[in-house]
Amino acid sequence: MCSLSFFSLFFMSTLIFILGIYYLMIDYSVFIEWELFNLNGSMVVMTLILDWMSLIFLSFVMYISSLVIYYSEDYMSNEKNINRFIMIVLMFILSMGFLIISPNLISILLGWDGLGLVSYCLVIYYQNVKSYSAGMLTALSNRIGDVAILISIAWMLNFGSWNYIYYYDFIVNSFEMKIITMLIVLAAMTKSAQIPFSSWLPAAMAAPTPVSALVHSSTLVTAGVYLLIRFSPMLNTYNCSWFLLFIGCLTMFMAGLGANLEFDLKKIIALSTLSQLGLMMSILAMGYPKLAFFHLLAHALFKALLFMCAGSMIHNLKDSQDIRFMGSIVNFMPLTSVCFNVSSLSLCGMPFLAGFYSKDLILEMVCLSWINCLIFFLYFFSTGLTASYSFRLFYYSMSGDNSFYSSFSFDDKGFYISFGMIALLFISVFSGSLLSWLVFPIPYMIVLPFYLKFLTITVVILGSYFGYLISNSSFSYNLFSFDMLSSFSFLGSMWFMPFLSTNFISYLPLKFGYYSSKSFDYSWGEMLGGQGLYSLFIYMINYIQSWYDSNFKIYLLTFIFWMFILIVLFSL
């Protein structure tokens, strides 16, 4: 089934890509309305939009999906239910296709909800408690976005249609469209894991690595960015762009810091994805949707390759994901090492690789734009952090001595794994130049002073040196480094966002319940209630009983006392 799915998706991807380039060349779009049924004059219509943007993105999704499924033939070879896994992945691709080619909010919701539901099934695919917790966090975080789209559908009820593409200029200044745009921004922030919804993205690493290569490169996490690219005319109209710009830059900065202090290989790559999503969101908020789309396509290719290389390493190292156990992998797995380093350099923006054409253009547009010093600093500092964690990954995994078992041997075994990586390697190298001439037939005219032109390469070199320094650093009992432990804990745990999204929600009510039961149920309530009355009665009974256990004087005194009372009563 893997081979059949691979050839089908690869063939469809090629056809759709050629069609997308043709539509781009002649500036052509197709708007299809398929009437499902007509009831008393009310039509139920399925609407599709086929323009160059949707077709090229769909072809990239199918191309990466085909290679991921082919890669799974080796990676999931010991899986008993491999066909079930492939079916779930195909449902995932179908949901993404619905989202891409729909200009209608209701059909977008079908794809959006489908992505959330199927991603939950994939995250909990390995059935253990950690996977269940990660799946629940993923599903509940994405539910917020689903609810936002549902509310926006309700707000659009008065417009006569849910095809948002009609309303860019028609009711651009209406109050309803302002609310809808804010809800769409909220939905995109949840799906693309922006602050404060970032915690589900590293948690979703509990899924199999082929799923990570698909989900965190071209599908689930980019759905929010793609939706905002479609809604980009509304962002600047309703002043949502400054908020989105700040959140995107903050997410990029937070993810870069977290990746430099993480030791789990898949989580480092997930945090790098989060950093690039923040970059896409922020450049989109600055008013460059084409540039955000260009980086989305380039990032999808080299990030899928990076995940495939990480999966090959994990597969050969008996499912060990800690980079401290790696080292000298370049001697054992040369093909994986070449692919891994090419994708890492592309992520950093190495000249003439795929990431360079989009990332360098983004940073030059940042220098050219009217933004304040804080945003400018966050952009370039985050770029340095990207180079830092990329060099740190190289340092731990490729250089030095092998830190795994001394009697252990591994190599680039597996034809399907190698084929998937090689197919993505070549397109990761050449796609940047190809896409730059396709998406921008007329290049941007950027005039910058010499020091701003060389600022990007300077920041990358300094970031790589910083990555080397933190790779060689360690805690010392004689220095003040342990005084900084709480700061490192804050920065390395995504600013405590996983805690705020999970334990914090239940922590305070449970703590309040514990202290309430301890203060009331186990103390005051118990002493004033059943246990208190029981103790009082026992005390009184023992006290009265002690009288009868005494000598004859007590009986005589009691007799005289009662006789006195009777005399007083009868005398009255």
Regions found by a protein language model. Give the residues of each.
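Core, highly hydrophobic multi-pass alpha-helical transmembrane subunits of bioenergetic inner membranes
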Residues: M1-L572
